[in-house]
Amino acid sequence: MNALACLAEAFAWLIRPGIRRFILLPLAVNITLFAAGSYAAFHYSDALVESLLPGWLAWLHWLLYPLLAVALLILTYYSFSLMANLIAAPFNSLLAAAVEKAERGDPSPPATPLWRDILMSLIQELHKLLYFLALALPTLILALILPPFAPVLWFLYTAWCAALQYLDYPMANNAVPFHAQRARLRQNRADTLACGGAISLLTTIPVLNLVAMPVGVIAATLYWCRHLRQP
């Protein structure tokens, strides 16, 4: 798939001249928050999983416990990823702009005040967060009603949200409204879910999760430039 090819290529961009300087601060944010996420996941997951298992399914405890544990682990890491993206949003937008400039060879866009970039990035992140929370509610209800399908439901949720999270940076830089972003990604649903799912899985792999954020931004920008951006 096109998006997965861009994701694989994104790792090489981490050391590309002109790109590295935009990665250092988001990388520091990622390391700090994923350390906190790992601590929370491994110290509180058992009690939470036990509380989510209904008594009438006790006979399936051996099967449902590992499934819910995996779903909770993915959700925990993705929650901390959202926090990291909120904090690093202005710098991720700069990284996306630098990658797009290098990929397309365009001249630099007109400079805007840093405070304005930070403010607009934070507003956009809050907008996305509200959308993600609104989408999480029906997903949670379905997961509670159908516990055996909870891991699949949460994986689809995190894949869609991760794709929106990272593709927003290059698309917002090109003044594509959030509702138009969602419409465009629905037209490329398979590629979108594959990319988002791969990035979500990347956040759960030790060591690789430390570079998941910049890799996700770079991959999303390459995918935007090569396959989504209209001439």
Which residues does each predicted region cover?
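Helix-coil boundary and N-terminal low-complexity module in membrane systems
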Residues: 1-136, 140, 178, 187-192, ...
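Hydrophobic alpha-helical segments
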Residues: 184, 188, 204, 226-230
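Alpha-helical transmembrane segments
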Residues: 170-183
